[in-house]
Amino acid sequence: MQVITSVKEAKQIVKDWKSHQLSIGYVPTMGFLHDGHLSLVKNAKTQDKVIVSIFVNPMQFGPNEDFSSYPRDLERDIKMCQDNGVDMVFIPDAAQMYLKNFSTYVDMNTITDKLCGAKRLGHFRGVCTVLAKFFNILNPDIVYMGQKDAQQCVVVRHMVDDLNFDLKIQICPIIREEDGLAKSSRNVYLSEEERKASLAISQSIFLAEKLVQEGEKDTSKIIQAMKDILEKEKLIKIDYIELVDFNTMENIKNIADNVLGAVAAFVGKTRLIDNFLVQGLK
């Protein structure tokens, strides 16, 4: 496995792979890897080569968010990548990604102002800008992203289509702890009491899925049922609960096919997200 920190060197390695007609699967991460990331790596191994990038992107954090305290353990991350058959770990620093006088950004005017985008101003501009750069540097064939960041997946798919990137975005299922909590690097922030309270988030998701399976169509009733579960936990503050069209992120009144049910909530000071997809509904 190669551990690369230079943009120039990464581009040269990719150029060599491509000259031998090797396909590239790419997993973008901010590090502090967990089983959710490793499931993306496993999916990426269907390609000839697998690249994992580790970059805590300052551009996608707001002024009062957790950039400085975001969990980092590079040595552990590199070992996990090596143990799971990754071919290249790309770890650039911010000075390489954002040169002096950097002034070019990728912005979007529609789906980024909903859900997390409405709460985290500038977040998706940072995500799209850094991923556009990574796509240009690493020239992947397929990019593997987790459904837990569902809105991000949709936003990046739109960017790929709009800017004619020659790659495919593959969305992979949410990986959960044994008790149901969605795997997240931020789970490490939770105290023991907060960790117990956080289960209300996944429980609200599972209840909503059950209601849909039982035939409930009224989204206001589903949202209220989810809200009732979350409000029982005094350590939880709801950020949003929404049911939206998965492609447009527009709110809907009645359940149909291709609907995203999404929750964001603060457990203590930690913001967690979770979701479910309604697909194949007849």
UniProtKB/Swiss-Prot annotation:
Q: Which residues form the active site?
A: 37 (proton donor)
Q: Which pathway does this chain act in?
A: Cofactor biosynthesis; (R)-pantothenate biosynthesis; (R)-pantothenate from (R)-pantoate and beta-alanine: step 1/1
* InterPro entries with a match to the protein in the record: Cyt_trans-like (IPR004821), Pantoate_ligase (IPR003721), Pantoate_ligase_C (IPR042176), Rossmann-like_a/b/a_fold (IPR014729)
Question: Where in or outside the cell?
Answer: Cytoplasm
Task: Indicate which residues the UniProt annotation says bind (R)-pantoate.
Answer: 60, 152
Self-association and partners:
Homodimer.
Indicate what this protein is called per its UniProt record: Pantothenate synthetase
